[in-house]
From Swiss-Prot:
Upper lineage: Eukaryota, Metazoa, Chordata, Craniata, Vertebrata
Gene Ontology terms: biological process: hematopoietic stem cell proliferation; lipid transport; membrane raft distribution; negative regulation of angiogenesis; regulation of cholesterol efflux; regulation of Notch signaling pathway; sprouting angiogenesis
Keywords: Lipid transport, Transport
One Pfam family here: YjeF_N
Domain YjeF N-terminal: 26-239
Superkingdom classification of source: Eukaryota
The protein's name in its UniProt record: YjeF N-terminal domain-containing protein 3
SUPFAM superfamilies the UniProt entry points to: YjeF N-terminal domain-like
Source organism (scientific name): Mus musculus
Gene3D superfamilies: YjeF N-terminal domain (3.40.50.10260)
Length: 251
C-alpha cells in the first residue's frame, strides 16, 4: 500500500515502494535525470558503463581468474545499451581485464563513434565477425557481456545481424552477463521468447525493470547509485543500500 505524510495542506500520498520499474516508468526516470537534473546522455552512459564493469569485477574477481578467464567478449548493439557496453569494455581494460568488442551493427551515432575511438586508442580489439561455431568463442574467452539490445529495443527492429549474434550467444557455455535487460527479453514480461538469452549475471541500470523479477541466474546487481534520493522516492524504489563507496549493490 502507498504511504502518506502530512504537510500544512494535509496528507500527501507517496508512491508504493517496490523494486521494479515498468518500461514507461524507466523511461520517465531517465527523462527526469536528463531534463530536471540536467544529466547529459554521455554522462549517464559513462556512469552505467563504469558501474557495469565494477559489477563484472565483483562477479568474476580478477585474482580468482586464470589468464584465459580474464578475456571478456563485449557484444555491443547500435542503441544506448551498446554505448554502455563500449564504456564498460574501456573500464574493464583499466581494471586489467582483457576485453574484445564485437558490434553486430555499427551505429552512426556520435556517442558510439566517440566511445569506439576511445576503445581503439586503448588497443581494445574489435572483431570483424562473430564465429558461428560457439566452441571457438568458449575456448577464446572467459565470459561474455551482452549489451546488444536493452530496454525498448525489440529484436525485429534491431535487424538480422543482431539476431544472428544472439542466436550464437544463446548457445555459449561460458558465463553471460547482461546489461539492464537481457537481449531478446520483453522489459515487462521477461525472457520466454525463443530468441532470448538466459544470462548468469544481470546488471540492472538505474533500477531493475519489471522483467528482472523473472531472472533466475546466479547474481543480480543494481547499478544506480547516481540516482538522487528524491528521484528514488518519487518512483517508490525500495532497493538495497550501497556499501561504502560501491557503485553497485547486490539484489
Amino acid at each position: 500500500m502507498s504511504s502518506s505524510v502530512h504537510n500544512n495542506t494535509g496528507p500527501v500520498q507517496l508512491p508504493e515502494e517496490r523494486r521494479f520499474l515498468s518500461a514507461s516508468e524507466a523511461a520517465a526516470l531517465e527523462r527526469e535525470l536528463l531534463e530536471e537534473y540536467r544529466f547529459g546522455r554521455q554522462q549517464l552512459v559513462e556512469l552505467c558503463g563504469h558501474a557495469s564493469a565494477v559489477a563484472v569485477t565483483k562477479a568474476f574477481p580478477l585474482p580468482s581468474l586464470s589468464r584465459k578467464q580474464r578475456t571478456v567478449l563485449v557484444v555491443c548493439g547500435p542503441e544506448q545499451n551498446g554505448a554502455v557496453g563500449l564504456a564498460c569494455a574501456r573500464h574493464l581494460r583499466v581494471f586489467e581485464y582483457q576485453p574484445s568488442i564485437f558490434c553486430p551493427a555499427r551505429s552512426a551515432d556520435a556517442l558510439h563513434r566517440d566511445l569506439t575511438t576511445q576503445c581503439e586508442k586503448m588497443d581494445i580489439p574489435f572483431l570483424s565477425f562473430l564465429p558461428a561455431e560457439v566452441r571457438l568463442i568458449d575456448d577464446a574467452y572467459g565470459l561474455v557481456v551482452d549489451a546488444v539490445l536493452g530496454p525498448g529495443v525489440r529484436l525485429a527492429e534491431a535487424g538480422g545481424h543482431c539476431a544472428r549474434a544472439l542466436a550464437t550467444l544463446k548457445r555459449l557455455s561460458i558465463p553471460l552477463v547482461s546489461l539492464d535487460v537481457p537481449s531478446g527479453w520483453d522489459a515487462e514480461a521477461g525472457g520466454d521468447a525463443k530468441d532470448a538469452v538466459q544470462p548468469d549475471v544481470l546488471v540492472s541500470l538505474a533500477a531493475p525493470k519489471s522483467c528482472a523479477g523473472r531472472f533466475s541466474g546466479r547474481l543480480h546487481f543494481v547499478a544506480g547509485r547516481f540516482v538522487p534520493d528524491d528521484v528514488r522516492r518519487k518512483f517508490g524504489l525500495h532497493l538495497p543500500k550501497y556499501t561504502g563507496t560501491d557503485c553497485v549493490a547486490s539484489l
